[in-house]
C-alpha cells in the first residue's frame, strides 16, 4: 500500500531528484514514493515511478545507502529494462513453444512419451536460463550506471555496496 506520509515522500523525492538529474535521460521525470511493506525491496515502474518499501528505508544506515538503491532503480528505468524484459520474455516464450512442438514431434516419431517429455524439459530449462541470464545482465547494468549517477550526485558511492552487503547479511547464506 502507498505510504501516505508527505514528509517521507518529500525526503525520497529530494534524494531521488538529485540522482535523476545526473541520469539526464532526455527529460524523463521520476517520481519516488514510499510503500508500506516491511520487506526490503524497491522497484521501478514504467514512466519513471520508483517505489521504496518502508522495510528497505528503515534498514538503510545512512543517506548514501538509500541513494544507492535509488540510483540502481533509476538505472533500470534509464536502461529501459522493463521494455527489454518484455521483449526477452517473448523470446523465451518462442523457445518454450519450439520445445513444445519439438516434444510433440519427437514423441510422435519415436512413439515414446518419455522422449517427448525429455525434449520439453530441456526446452523449458533453456527458456528459464535465458530469463536468468537476462536478469543478471540487467542487475549488473543497473549497478554500473547507478554508481555513476550516485557519485555524480555527490553521494558516497560506497553506499550502494554497503547496503547490498547489509542485504546479504539479512538474507543469510543461500
Task: Indicate where each model-derived feature is located.
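Peri-catalytic and regulatory segments of divalent metal-dependent proteins
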Residues: 1-109, 127-134, 141-174
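A structural motif
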Residues: 106-126
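Active-site-adjacent, His/Asp/Glu-enriched structural segments that form or flank metal-binding
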Residues: 120-122, 138-141
Amino acid at each position: 500500500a502507498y505510504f501516505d506520509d508527505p514528509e517521507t515522500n518529500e525526503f525520497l523525492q529530494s534524494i531521488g531528484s538529485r540522482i535523476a538529474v545526473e541520469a539526464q535521460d532526455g527529460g524523463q521525470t521520476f517520481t519516488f514514493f514510499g510503500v508500506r511493506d516491511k520487506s526490503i525491496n524497491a522497484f521501478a515502474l514504467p514512466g519513471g515511478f520508483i517505489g521504496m518499501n518502508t522495510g528497505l528505508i528503515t534498514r538503510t544506515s545512512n543517506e548514501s545507502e538509500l541513494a544507492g538503491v535509488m540510483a540502481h532503480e533509476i538505472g533500470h528505468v534509464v536502461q529501459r529494462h522493463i521494455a527489454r524484459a518484455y521483449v526477452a520474455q517473448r523470446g523465451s516464450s518462442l523457445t518454450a513453444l519450439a520445445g513444445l512442438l519439438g516434444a510433440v514431434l519427437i514423441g510422435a516419431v519415436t512413439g515414446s512419451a518419455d522422449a517427448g517429455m525429455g525434449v520439453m524439459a530441456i526446452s523449458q530449462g533453456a527458456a528459464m536460463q535465458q530469463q536468468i541470464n537476462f536478469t543478471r545482465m540487467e542487475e549488473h547494468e543497473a549497478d554500473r550506471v547507478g554508481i555513476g549517477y550516485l557519485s555524480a550526485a555527490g553521494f558516497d558511492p560506497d553506499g550502494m555496496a554497503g547496503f547490498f552487503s547489509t542485504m546479504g547479511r539479512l538474507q543469510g547464506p543461500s
